[in-house]
């Protein structure tokens, strides 16, 4: 069954040494509110491994019930004159101590992307996660995601990558893909990186996506303490 959800993907700029405080504030205090008031589920709040990209930063991923669920979420947030949910005024005030802003995307999942519930049931989790942003030829995001399922995922599974989700970015020219995978250990991640240069199948995959993928950039993420994939519990 195709995944019917829509996702909000957030890159959060952290102030100083407040990443752990922000991640706890987001998961412990906002996660349950999002679920009960908006049916907005936290897939993950991860810390970016600074050596692999910008820091200090978190990556947040939220699951909603399709486009209508997202529309209801926006109405809930922006209906008032302050353009802010009144019940979250205190939450926002505290969060302002920990973050300075961010950059968000709306993501549409590939049909083979597991929902949060399915990911928990399958035991998808890792000591570390890979987060890949792929720039594709405009109009080719769906093509890339199909190729990913048919040709890359068998290789990825053999190497030790578990798919958390593969998504195309909405509200752009069908030109960006986000792929998040779980890796069981740091040692396994090191083996995967070594395979990029040495594994014949990896080289074949890169040649196959020439003309579809323009460029990509990967970074590493680690779980926050209350991450649902880590605990096996929806917030």
Listing of model-derived features with the role each one plays in the protein:
Residues 2, 20-44, 50-55, 63-107, ...:
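An amphipathic, aromatic/His-enriched active-site/gating alpha helix that lines ligand/cofactor pockets
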Residues 2-21, 109-187, 225-230:
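Surface-exposed interaction/gating patches
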Residues 47-48, 118:
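Catalytic micro-motifs at enzyme active sites that drive phosphoryl/nucleotidyl and oxygen chemistry
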Residues 51-59, 172-178:
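The conserved glycine-aromatic submotif of the RRM
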Residues 233-235:
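C-terminal/domain-terminus segments
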